[in-house]
Amino acid sequence: MITVKPGCVTFQNVRKSFGAFTAIPDLSLSIEPGTLVTLLGPSGCGKTTTLRMLAGLEHPTSGRILIGGADVTMLPANERDVSMVFQSYALFPHMTSLDNVAYGLQSSGLGKKEAREKAEEGLKLVGLAGMGHRLPAELSGGQQQRVAVARALVLEPQVLLLDEPLSNLDARLRRRVRTEIRELQQRLGFTAVYVTHDQDEALAVSDRIIVMKDGEIAQSGTPRELYEAPASSFIADFMGEANVIPCEVIGVEGTEALIRVAGVDHRLPGRNAKAGMAKLAVRPGSITIAAAGQQGLAGRVLHSAYLGGHVEYEVETDVGTLFIIDHAVERNLPPSSDVTLGFENRGIALINA
């Protein structure tokens, strides 16, 4: 039987330099046992370097890394109680699925019979029972990914590390496999650290998301917290596309704020708002379109694109060009159409300047 012993993860003032370049200046974070935490950010933000330090594939220049309360800072990878699922899956092409899953168990000293029995259990766990005889080339991309997950899980690590595990799959398969990973993590309760640059993927699988920028934590929180209450323009735009609009907070009453955009006043949710200049992050689907001449923000359609279930517009306004998703496909506004824009109460966040 495969059992898990979920461990906590702690980084204490970790710094990582490559020659004169500092990839991680000063990183401190903690991950609770039994949670799936995603390191999210654009290329070069430091998320993969952070994962590699946790795996023991890189060592920090300074600082401490703890797994399950034990200091593993300078331990080699093979002495850490972690398993890693690589972006390429790293399956041995000449071995069957069963042998791939059993390989790590046998390398760690388990007898061949016991290793194969546990490997069969691992394949069953990921929905590949009866497919242990197949070579990697005889499996689909999604099945290969599940073999890689099974190989990692049978070692019963304190922490499972996943490095962009879905990047080699097509969009439809990515959605299915990310659901399978999340269901498996919740069912077994293991600790997982997941690296991706895909915001939708992070929102779908995570208990908590750590967004990184330039080797530092830009914001950490639940998927809902990051999407609905971004701490900066960078977070607002990175966690799903957002229009960032300059505005002025005229006043705040309870949870509602009076906001002025291009001379037009709006009453909108004002979480933690303060009077003064600010920025308004508005999701493309939270901008309303009405006929020209009404009260609101005047604009002119620059471009439109019909995408079946919705129409995408770029509209020029006094506060810049706004990107809008409109589900009223029958509206079908051609370029140069004059319109009036407004804001819904959902999908909007105030960011203090």
Curated annotation (Swiss-Prot):
One of its GO terms (cellular component) is ATP-binding cassette (ABC) transporter complex. Part of the ABC transporter complex FbpABC involved in Fe(3+) ions import. Responsible for energy coupling to the transport system. Belongs to the ABC transporter superfamily. Fe(3+) ion importer (TC 3.A.1.10) family. Keywords: ATP-binding, Cell inner membrane, Cell membrane, Ion transport, Iron, Iron transport, Membrane, Nucleotide-binding, Translocase, Transport. The gene is fbpC. The keyword Cell inner membrane applies. It is found in: Cell inner membrane. Residues 9-239 form the ABC transporter domain. ATP binds at G41, P42, S43, G44, C45, G46, K47, T48. This is Fe(3+) ions import ATP-binding protein FbpC. PROSITE patterns: ABC_TRANSPORTER_1, ABC_TRANSPORTER_2, FBPC. It comes from Rhizobium etli (strain ATCC 51251 / DSM 11541 / JCM 21823 / NBRC 15573 / CFN 42). The keyword Transport applies. The complex is composed of two ATP-binding proteins (FbpC), two transmembrane proteins (FbpB) and a solute-binding protein (FbpA). It is a peripheral membrane protein. It catalyses: Fe(3+)(out) + ATP + H2O = Fe(3+)(in) + ADP + phosphate + H(+). It holds the Pfam family TOBE_2. One of its GO terms (molecular function) is ATP hydrolysis activity. Its EC number is 7.2.2.7.
